[in-house]
C-alpha cells in the first residue's frame, strides 16, 4: 500500500499510464489484424491501403515507447513481405 503522498501519486499515474498503454497496444493489434484480413481477401489494393494506415499507427506507437522500434520494424517488414508475396 502506498503510504507517502508521492507514492500515492505514482500509483495513480501508473494506473492511467497502464490504461493508455493497453489501449495503444490494442490499437496496434487491431491495425495488424486489418492488414492480415485484407491480405486474406486476396485484393492487393485493399491490402496496400490497409498497410499504409497500419504503418502510421505502428510508427506512432513506437515513437511513444509503447513498443520497441525494432519490433515496429519487424511488424512492418513482415506485413510488407506478405503483401509482396500476393499474386
Swiss-Prot record:
Keyword hit for RNA-binding: yes
Gene3D superfamilies in the record: Ribosomal protein S20 (1.20.58.110)
SUPFAM superfamilies: Ribosomal protein S20
Database matches in InterPro entries: Ribosomal_bS20, Ribosomal_bS20_sf
A Pfam family it matches: Ribosomal_S20p
Record keywords, A-Z: Ribonucleoprotein, Ribosomal protein, RNA-binding, rRNA-binding
Positions in coiled-coil regions: none
One annotated Gene Ontology cellular component of this protein: cytosol
PANTHER family assigned: 30S RIBOSOMAL PROTEIN S20 (PTHR33398), SMALL RIBOSOMAL SUBUNIT PROTEIN BS20C (PTHR33398:SF1)
Protein purpose: Binds directly to 16S ribosomal RNA.
Name of the protein in its database record: Small ribosomal subunit protein bS20
Naturally occurring in which organism (per UniProt): Nitrosospira multiformis (strain ATCC 25196 / NCIMB 11849 / C 71)
Lineage: Bacteria, Pseudomonadati, Pseudomonadota, Betaproteobacteria, Nitrosomonadales
Annotated gene: rpsT
